[in-house]
Structures are given as C-alpha cells and as structure tokens.
UniProtKB/Swiss-Prot annotation:
Modified residues (Phosphoserine): S149
InterPro entries: L-lactate/malate_DH, Lactate/malate_DH_C, Lactate/malate_DH_N, Lactate_DH/Glyco_Ohase_4_C, Malate_DH_type3, NAD(P)-bd_dom_sf
Protein's UniProt keywords contain Oxidoreductase: yes
Keywords (A to Z) from UniProt: NAD, Oxidoreductase, Phosphoprotein, Tricarboxylic acid cycle
MF annotations from Gene Ontology: L-malate dehydrogenase (NAD+) activity
Origin species: Bacillus subtilis (strain 168)
Designated name of the protein: Malate dehydrogenase
Residue numbers binding NAD(+): G12, A13, G14, F15, T16, G17, D36, N100, L123, T124, N125
Biological process (GO), any one: tricarboxylic acid cycle
Function of the molecule: Catalyzes the reversible oxidation of malate to oxaloacetate.
Active site (UniProt): H180 (proton acceptor)
Reaction equations catalysed: (S)-malate + NAD(+) = oxaloacetate + NADH + H(+)
Length: 312
C-alpha cells in the first residue's frame, strides 16, 4: 500500500502556528510540517521535536517536522498560513497590511510551487485582505483559498453566552458575519442555546453587551497579555477547519470566502456561513437579513474595502 497519510503544512511557527501544529498532530489528523524563516529554523525544529516527544505520553501517531525549507512541504493537502507580524497594543489593523501582504505573496509562491493541489487556510491579519492577497497571488480557484475568523469570533460569542446563561458551550450555537474587526456582525437571530432562541433567554441589553464584547474579543486579549495576541482559540479554530476538510465533514462554519454576488457583494473576501468539506469551500449559505443586519454588514464590508485599498 502507498502512503495515504495526510499532510498539513503550517507556515509560521509562532504561538498560533505551533499550537495549531500540535492540535492537528494530537488529533492525528495529519503529519505536520512547521515552517518558519531561516533565522528561526532551529527554534522551529526545537518546537517540532518537543511536540513529537509529547506523542508517546499523549498517545498520538503523527510525524512533526520543523524546517525553513519549503521543499519539505511538498505535496501538502492543506497549507495553513499564520506567518506575519503581530499586532501590538495601539497598532491599527491597517498598519499590518503592507508588511503582511509582502509575506503572504512570498509564502504563496512557495505553496504554489510545492503543493499546487493544496487547500490554503489563511489566519494572518488583517485576515479578509490577506486571504484576498493569497487568492490573487496563487491563481487557485476560490474554493481552495479560505480565511479563518468566523469560527473564532463565533467561539468567543458562544463562550460569553454560555457564561451568561451558566450553560455548556456545547449547547450554544451562533453565527458571526462580516469582517474580522470592530464591525463584525454577530447574528443574534440565528443564535440558540439548546435549540431555544437566545432572544427569549437573555435580555436585550445583556445580548448587546455580549455582542460588543465579541467585537472587541481580540483586543481584550491583546490588552491583557500586554505582549502578543490570542493563540489558543485561533489555533483551535484553524484545527476545526482543517478537520472539516480532511474528513470531508461538510460542516456549517463561518469562514472568509470569496463572494461573487452572494449577499450583493462582488470580488471581496468576507466572513459568511459556508459549508466546509473535502474540496475546501463547498458552498456559501445566503441568509435572509433584516434591514438592520444588512446595514451592519454594509458597514463591515466598507471596513474590509478600506483595508483592501492599502493592498498593492
């Protein structure tokens, strides 16, 4: 029998990339190649070896390799991009754009060269614009270039709702639309706890507070850490997307997808409900929006477009 093991490459061996690599290996979803720049090759190899040495204790079989050589990523089923400079306190997302766009373009050229059939999942911020940059640089079909923010934003929303109601997070579902920023749109109407609409369980002013905290969720953690940004929940969110693709689960997940007329928008990457499976983006789900939700989404789209203007 030939080698049927799946292969996932994670570009960027910082906190998020390394945690993602570990979670993917731990769940035995695939063998993992962790990649960073040549100056960081030894620390990257060290992290990979450290994870590998956890495998007998955790009881997982997966190869984990650290490298700065993209040849090692050849034939990846999925490539996850977490590389880029991090956002520091007081730094706007737009400050990140030019630097991270250059990184996206160079990384994407390597992905196209060594894994031309891969599906790319982008996490690097500002993620809507960075996913667009990767899509344009790769020449891949839109189904094979998707961004992660909605799974994370929705996870934050679900966490805060579960805390508010003192319920299991497993029983809370929700959806967050739009860009990954202060203008994201948590769709409360489509959010439930144990199948019961949230609006019947939580007073409006508490829901509004939860929505606001969700919007500021990334910033809250940046401020608490004082140095760096969230990585456990982002890595868990990436891993959920990777699992949905590798196992062809056809999960309904909010992802950053390329719109061609859906929701009335054209030629833009935006967070929308999607079906994620073996081909990557299987389908975009169009929800009926109220005038208020539509206005909020328009505002979110304008924010994304303003960031995209900075792209070369």
């Amino acid at each position: 029998m030939g080698n049927t093991r799946k292969k996932v490459s994670v570009i960027g061996a910082g906190f998020t990339g390394a945690t993602t690599a570990f979670l993917i290996a731990q769940k035995e979803l695939a063998d993992v190649v962790l990649v960073d720049i040549p100056q960081l090759e030894n620390p990257t190899k060290g992290k990979a070896l450290d994870m590998l040495e956890a495998s007998p204790v955790q009881g997982f079989d997966a190869k984990i390799t650290g490298t700065s050589n993209y040849e090692d990523t050849a034939g990846s089923d999925i490539v996850v991009i977490t590389a880029g400079i991090a956002r520091k306190p007081g730094m706007s997302r737009d400050d990140l754009v030019s630097t991270n766009e250059k990184i996206m373009r160079s990384v994407t050229q390597e992905i196209v060269k060594y894994s031309p059939d891969s599906i790319i999942v982008v996490l690097t911020n500002p993620v809507d614009a960075m996913t667009y940059a990767v899509y344009k640089e790769s020449g891949f079909p839109k189904e094979r270039v998707i961004g992660q923010s909605g799974v994370l934003d929705t996870a934050r929303f679900r966490t805060f709702v579960a805390e508010e109601l003192n319920l299991s997070v497993k029983d809370v579902t929700g959806f967050v639309l739009g860009g990954h920023g202060d203008d994201m749109v948590p769709l409360v109407r489509y959010s439930y706890a144990g199948g019961i609409p949230l609006e019947t369980l939580i007073p409006k002013e508490r829901i509004d507070a939860i929505v606001e905290r969700t919007r500021k969720g990334g910033g809250e953690i940046v401020n608490l850490l004082g140095n760096g940004s969230a990585y456990y929940a982002p890595a868990a969110s990436l891993t959920e997307m990777v699992e949905a693709i590798l196992k062809d689960q056809r999960r309904v997940l909010p992802t950053i997808a390329y719109l061609e007329g859906e929701y009335g928008y054209e030629g833009i990457y935006l967070g929308v409900p999607t079906i994620v499976g073996g081909n990557g983006l299987e389908q975009i789900i169009e929800l009926e929006l109220t005038d208020y939700e539509r206005a909020q989404l328009n505002k979110s789209v304008e924010s994304v477009k303003n960031v995209m203007k900075v792209l070369s």
